[in-house]
Amino acid sequence: LIGEMDLALAQARFTIYGVAELYNDQEKKSDLVNEINIAKHTVTNRALEVVDKAMRLVGAKSLQRSNPLQRYYRDVRAGLHNPPMDDLTIKKLAETAIQQMTKN
């Protein structure tokens, strides 16, 4: 599980740093809506995976108030309720892909 957790963290890190680098490019900045939404989706869902696996490793003690994992669990779940929602991100990506296919 620890290797899987590290992999998920690396995926999230590379995604967010990649989008941040694109965002710093003034010419591309205005065209990054999908990329930013992908980053939010990826980072939130990878964080959920990591916290869930960490809690599985620790067991029931991970739910105790004194354990920071219970707070991390709540904090990362909050990302699911902040826009854009996962289903809207996926729908927008599909719409963009269809538009690009019909242009060509």
Spans of features found by a protein language model:
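C-terminal helix-coil-helix/basic helical segment that borders enzyme active sites and/or dimer interfaces
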Residues: 10-42, 55-58, 62-63
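Short, hydrophobic/aliphatic alpha-helical segments
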Residues: 43-48, 73
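Glycine-rich phosphate/cofactor-binding loops in nucleotide/flavin-utilizing enzymes
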Residues: 61-104
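Nucleic acid-contacting regions in RNA/DNA-associated proteins
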Residues: 52
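Glycine-rich beta->alpha junctions and the first turn(s) of the following alpha-helix
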Residues: 1-10
